[in-house]
Amino acid sequence: MNPRRVVVTGMGALTPIGNTLPQFWDGLISGTSGANNITHFDASKFKTKFACEIKGYDPLNFFEKKEVRRYDKFAQYALVVAKEAIKDAKLGESKINNDKVGVIWGAGIGGLETFQNEVLNFSEGDGTPRFNPFFIPKMIPDIAPGLISIKYGFHGPNFATVSACASSANAIIDGLNYIRMGYSDIIVAGGSEAPITIAGMAGFNAMHALSTRNDDPLTASRPFDRDRDGFVLGEGAGALILEEYEHAKNREAKIYAEISGIGLSSDAYHMTAPHPDGKGAIKVMKNCLDDAKLNTSDIDLINMHGTSTSLGDIAETKAVKQVFQEDVYNLNINSTKSMTGHLLGASGAIEGISCILAMNNSMVPPTINHFNRDENIDPKLNLTFSKPQKKEINACLSNTFGFGGHNACIIFTKL
């Protein structure tokens, strides 16, 4: 029996290059860099003093003061994009069965700022534990889908996925599977992250994961460039309304794309480094193509994980060449992170949205900040450097990989 088909009928975005879905697309096509000096805290003594922050975000535009105190930023971001996606899908204008609507949400870390501030307050005291009663519920990753379901009365499957930078891609994959199996008709899937904190920046600096290009933050995220020196930390959220195809047709919903294939694998190699030959990445892309019943020649665009790290970019390009063989030279490749920075657990959702917008607008967003060719990367690959490229896109493959060796891959197609 063929599984139930799953389509995307609504989207929402809150990113360092745009605070709404249309603004995000404008930022992508304009080749906007979201990086700049950190304003969230005094980073003057930090090894890295810049990040990709959301600009102009005021929580009081979305929440009451009481809610702002009770919700960590990552949960606020989740509610903001869920609202945009639900409105975009016109769920409020349709008669739907809320028992068949679920929320599955990815976050690699969750309420990091809440955890950090509570522990700092305790350490500065006399040893008496005086913790905020909302400390635990503000911090846990699953509070984001919980709050979304509470706000909208969705009674279907509700949980968080935690797989580092692959978290929201896993949320989309789980959402698709719940619809395929008939547990749900609609899943609000996505991810959010707010890691630009003292602890977040210090922790990633201690790993030597971040770029330290403090003299030129705008160009610091430079995937596939010879002189890349680490990723740029970002923050934000993305939401997608996943819906069973016949259900969407029956309510005359706008359909952006179909999710045709999914893949999962593990490197089983190292805590943070990818396998140097990209073995896990090779496996996950092959699994995804098999699930979609597509050939490599059917793919028009690959949205790379492309973090701007020395090891990661080389391993991923090796894997893509191994999977796609000669077909790799007929498609476009890009890295959204060159503009948004690395949104960690929100990356998969935001980059999935980027793929869908690229298909709907027949335009490939660029990989910005390329200055010098890396001799370890095939110069014949079309990495969409510097400028967007007009292209008819019928199928887009999106890679998302996480610390721990978690690999997730999703193929979006036009109907």
Question: What kind of region is each of these model predictions?
Answer:
Residues 5-9, 36, 215-292, 300-301:
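Condensing-enzyme catalytic core mediating Claisen C-C bond formation in acyl metabolism
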Residues 125-132, 173, 177, 193-250, ...:
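Glycine-/small-residue-rich "gating" segment that lines the acyl/pantetheine channel
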Residues 78-91, 149-152, 158-193, 232-253, ...:
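Active-site-proximal alpha-helical scaffold in enzymes
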Residues 1-67, 246-258, 353-368, 413-415:
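ACP-dependent fatty acid/polyketide chain-elongation machinery
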Residues 78-89, 144, 171, 244, ...:
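Short, well-ordered amphipathic alpha-helical segments that serve as non-catalytic structural scaffolds
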Residues 183-229, 262-276, 306-313, 330-381:
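Acyl-CoA/ACP chain-elongation machinery
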Residues 8, 25, 32-163, 192-201, ...:
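Conserved beta-ketoacyl condensing-enzyme motif
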Residues 10, 28, 82, 103, ...:
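Conserved small-residue
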